Curated annotation (Swiss-Prot):
Gene Ontology biological process terms in this record: maturation of LSU-rRNA from tricistronic rRNA transcript (SSU-rRNA, 5.8S rRNA, LSU-rRNA); translation
Family: Belongs to the universal ribosomal protein uL29 family.
UniProt keyword Iron present: no
InterPro entries for this protein: Ribosomal_uL29 (IPR001854), Ribosomal_uL29_euk (IPR045059), Ribosomal_uL29_sf (IPR036049)
Any GO MF annotation of the entry: structural constituent of ribosome
Domain of life per record: Eukaryota
GO cellular component, as recorded: cytosolic large ribosomal subunit
Gene3D superfamilies in the record: 1.10.287.310, 6.10.250.3450
Record's protein name: Large ribosomal subunit protein uL29
Pfam families: Ribosomal_L29 (PF00831)
Length: 123
C-alpha cells in the first residue's frame, strides 16, 4: 500500500473513488483480523496508512458532493444551513446592508421635504 496523493484522487470519477474506498476498507478489515490473530506484526504499521487513505478518499468524495450541492442551490434564495458560509453568531445575526439603510416613512418624508441645513460662518 503506497501513500495516496490527493491531487491524483481529485482526477478520479465518483465511481472510481467508491471502488477504491471499498478496496481500502477490505484491506483494513484484513489488517485488523491479522492484528487480532497476531499473525503478521509487520502489517500493524500499515493500518495507519490505510486508515489515512480511507480518510483522504472520503474527504475528496465529500468535498465534491458538497461543491455539487453548492452549485445546485446557488440560484435558489434559500440554501441549507450546512452550505451557508461559516460565520460567527454575531455576523449571522447582524442586519443586512439593505436592512441597515431602510428608513421609516416619517424619515423619508422629512428628508424629501426639508433640505439639509447649510451653515455659513461670517469672517
Amino acid at each position: 500500500m503506497e501513500k495516496l496523493r490527493v491531487f491524483e484522487l481529485r482526477e478520479k470519477s465518483d465511481a472510481e473513488l467508491l471502488k477504491l474506498l471499498d478496496d481500502l476498507k477490505q484491506e483494513l478489515a484484513t489488517f485488523r483480523v491479522s492484528k487480532v490473530t497476531a499473525t503478521g506484526t509487520s502489517k500493524l504499521s500499515k493500518i495507519t496508512l490505510v486508515r489515512k487513505a480511507v480518510a483522504k478518499v472520503l474527504t475528496v468524495y465529500n468535498q465534491r458532493k458538497k461543491e455539487e450541492a453548492r452549485k445546485k442551490y446557488k440560484k435558489l434564495s434559500k440554501t441549507p444551513l450546512n452550505l451557508r458560509p461559516k460565520l460567527t453568531r454575531a455576523k449571522r445575526k447582524a442586519l443586512t446592508t439593505k436592512q441597515l439603510t431602510m428608513k421609516t416613512i416619517k424619515e423619508r418624508k422629512r428628508a424629501e421635504n426639508l433640505p439639509k441645513r447649510k451653515y455659513a460662518l461670517l469672517v
